[in-house]
Amino acid sequence: MTRDEARAKIIFALDVNEFSDVEKWADLLSPHVGMFKVGKQLYTACGPAVVRMIQKYGGEVFLDLKYHDIPNTVAMASLEAARMGVKLFNLHALGGYEMMAKTVETLDKEFKGEERGKVLAVTILTSSNEQTLQEVGINLPVPEMVVKLAALAKKAGIDGVVASPQEVPLIREACGNDFLIVTPGVRPAFAAADDQKRIMTPAEAVKSGADYLVIGRPIAAAPNPAEAAQAIVAEIVAG
């Protein structure tokens, strides 16, 4: 794998809430990462303009808002996300088949085969474990529930999933290779696990078949964030 291919796999999590911080990170890291993740805090604080800010610096955007509502509401929100030109955006697989299928149908009707952002389904959050699932009445092991949701998403026409790297081989087996897998819960060896329970190193995650890796604090909190991103790229290349 080349350095450019490895770099393209890295999604930097913009865990900030100010335009000035977004501009700083977009300027600093655009040469070193493949995409920027805009989550709920940043989008609520700054709105769609933050997407345009990143695009101005040549950056691609993963709009991580995890839509979960009635089918029509999610479909219309997803349509607006796609119209903004983001590369990836997502919804919750727990919203069910109808919600996901309606979203895909709406996007297909609008774009008519033209290139659009890929829609991903969130399976089980990486902060969750068996106890978390049991608390909401789900009595399946995490890996089994993840695969069940991933298969449902593929059946509905969704482009891929967001899932823990540990579940990547199971998802590949159930859904095939033409299905995107984005993995948070990725931490290089020099970083602490923070609040995510199911984690893996970047090299391990890519080796297991992940297409994109969401990485935030290990880059942002490093003394030299650009060098940290470069070190992660080197780790992926080395395998």
Curated annotation (Swiss-Prot):
BP GO terms, sorted: 'de novo' pyrimidine nucleobase biosynthetic process; 'de novo' UMP biosynthetic process
Organism: Geotalea daltonii (strain DSM 22248 / JCM 15807 / FRC-32) (Geobacter daltonii)
Self-association and partners: Homodimer.
Lineage, highest ranks first: Bacteria, Pseudomonadati, Thermodesulfobacteriota, Desulfuromonadia, Geobacterales
Keywords, ordered alphabetically: Decarboxylase, Lyase, Pyrimidine biosynthesis
Family assignment from sequence similarity: Belongs to the OMP decarboxylase family. Type 1 subfamily.
GO molecular function: orotidine-5'-phosphate decarboxylase activity
Name the UniProt record assigns to this protein: Orotidine 5'-phosphate decarboxylase
EC number assigned by the record: 4.1.1.23
Catalytic activity: orotidine 5'-phosphate + H(+) = UMP + CO2
Keyword Lyase: yes
Gene Ontology CC entries for this record: cytosol
Database matches in NCBIfam families: PRK00230.1, pyrF
Gene giving rise to this polypeptide: pyrF
Keyword Lyase (UniProt): yes
Classification via Pfam families: OMPdecase
Function according to Swiss-Prot or TrEMBL: Catalyzes the decarboxylation of orotidine 5'-monophosphate (OMP) to uridine 5'-monophosphate (UMP).
Broadest EC class assigned to this enzyme: lyase
